[in-house]
């Protein structure tokens, strides 16, 4: 496969790295690791995260035309090539480390080394909102009113909508927070409230 992206001989991306699929992937990985560390605490250990091919396609096909690595629908094999060790930019490996990728039936396992977990713990700012949300939904008697108030604590510009798909009751999202574009989907299970968050493109794919 021919790459359109340009790298120097040290694998530094010499274009606008921040608009590449690699940067989008790195942000997603860091977001999830931070969420896990807020839930479970920090350990310097391997973390394995799983992505469907459709999500990885969004990362790389949503970049500007000059930064696309492959045109059209990226296949599983093409994605494995994109994420091969010799194709990973130094900007990515300097943060979350030398990730390892495997795939089966369009489901990708991304293995982050212990150094990546350590980097997230020591070099990224705590996500106070996520920490508070996790603590809130973990308390007995938590209500959607309390959750909504928490969102308003961090922004006056949010959107909350009911969902009628049988899986979630509603979603809330920040409208003008470029670092947090997730749809936070909530379901009241009676004894407690659970949530899952989705990137906008994935939320659209699910057709909720």
Go through each PLM region and give its residues.
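Amphipathic alpha-helical segments
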Residues: 75-77, 81-84, 140-156
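Charge-enriched amphipathic alpha-helical scaffolds
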Residues: 47, 57-98
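Charged low-complexity interaction tracts in eukaryotic proteins
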Residues: 8-20, 85-124, 168-170, 174-177, ...
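Intrinsically disordered, low-complexity regulatory segments enriched in Ser/Thr/Pro
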Residues: 178-208
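N-terminal trafficking/processing presequences and adjacent post-cleavage segments
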Residues: 3-5, 126-144
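A cross-family detector of function-defining hotspots
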Residues: 143, 149-184
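Short glycine-rich, basic-tinged beta-strand/loop micro-motifs
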Residues: 41-64, 129-137
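Short alpha-helical segments that sit at the start of domains
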Residues: 5-40, 125-126
């Amino acid at each position: 496969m021919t790459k359109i992206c340009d790298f120097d001989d040290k694998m530094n991306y010499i274009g606008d790295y921040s608009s590449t699929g690699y940067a989008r992937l790195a942000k997603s990985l860091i977001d999830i690791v931070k969420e896990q560390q807020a839930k479970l605490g920090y350990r310097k250990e391997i973390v394995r995260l799983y992505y469907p091919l459709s999500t990885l396609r969004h990362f790389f096909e949503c970049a500007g035309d000059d930064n696309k690595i492959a045109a059209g629908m990226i296949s599983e094999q093409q994605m494995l090539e994109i994420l091969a060790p010799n194709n990973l930019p130094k900007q990515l490996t300097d943060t979350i480390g030398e990730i390892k990728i495997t795939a089966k039936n369009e489901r990708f396992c991304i293995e982050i080394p212990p150094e990546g977990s350590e980097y997230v713990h020591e070099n990224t700012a705590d996500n106070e909102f996520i920490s508070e949300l996790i603590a809130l939904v973990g308390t007995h008697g938590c209500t959607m009113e309390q959750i909504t108030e928490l969102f308003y604590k961090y922004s006056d510009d949010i959107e909350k909508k009911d969902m009628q798909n049988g899986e979630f009751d509603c979603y809330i999202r920040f409208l003008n927070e470029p670092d947090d574009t997730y749809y936070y989907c909530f379901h009241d299970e009676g004894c407690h409230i659970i949530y899952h968050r989705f990137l906008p493109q994935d939320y659209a794919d699910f057709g909720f």
